[in-house]
Amino acid sequence: MAVDERKIVIWCGAAPNQKALANKLASKYNVAGIVIDEHKKTSTRKKFSEIVSALIDRIKFRKIYGAWKWLMYNYASGYSEWPNVPMLRVESINNEQAAAFTREINPDLIIVSGTGLVKEPLLSLPASIGIINLHTGLSPYVKGGPNCTNWCIANNEWHLVGNTIMWLNAGIDTGNIITTEAIDIRNAADLQQAHKMVMEHAHDLYLRAVEYLFTNTKPYNSVPQQSVGKGKLYLTKMWTAEKRKLLLQNWEDRKKITLVPVVNTVPLPLEN
């Protein structure tokens, strides 16, 4: 029996870590429906040289690729099924079916994680509390992809590893912040465990943010990112072989780093 009967709809990706988050939420709250964005794209034929280059890259940087692959396997083993609730699978989160499915449920809260960029009319769908999003990076300092934790390691910015829960808007990780927290991963045994630490922290922060929203009344925490600090948007095309080399080198030297820089974070209010 859900502790709180207010209805939640989850918009999420299809990866095992999203399935884990959905199960954690459903174990505590009334998840009334889930829309799974399967990110289906039109396939394009690659040149043989591109295939060979990609294969060499994966072999050369297998520790990086392997860490994420292990994390997904770990979650797939722990959460074999999605919660037993109404579910819709779409090729894109912006499919009209996703909007219709959500309208029919009329949720109090919409929770977003791991989808493509959400656009109208979904952004304007009614929800009495609102639409919130998980960013597995510390906003406003680190945004984009392919992985904010990896960028922090490559840049030797260990103090910027963390997670953010924000109100969803039309930008890329630009919504007003509900809460942020940093996490120190330097004592992790390997990259696999480091990514597991960050993802588990992300799920825990999401659950605490939902609890905050459900146990308080408006106005909720809503901190403009520009009032917290300045950051950088990273694009996948910027994630070069040189950056991957730096990640591996910095990971090996992580114990030599002292976390001196202090940045502003946004704690959850103790009470409204």
Regions found by a protein language model. Give the residues of each.
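One-carbon transfer enzymes
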Residues: M1-N272
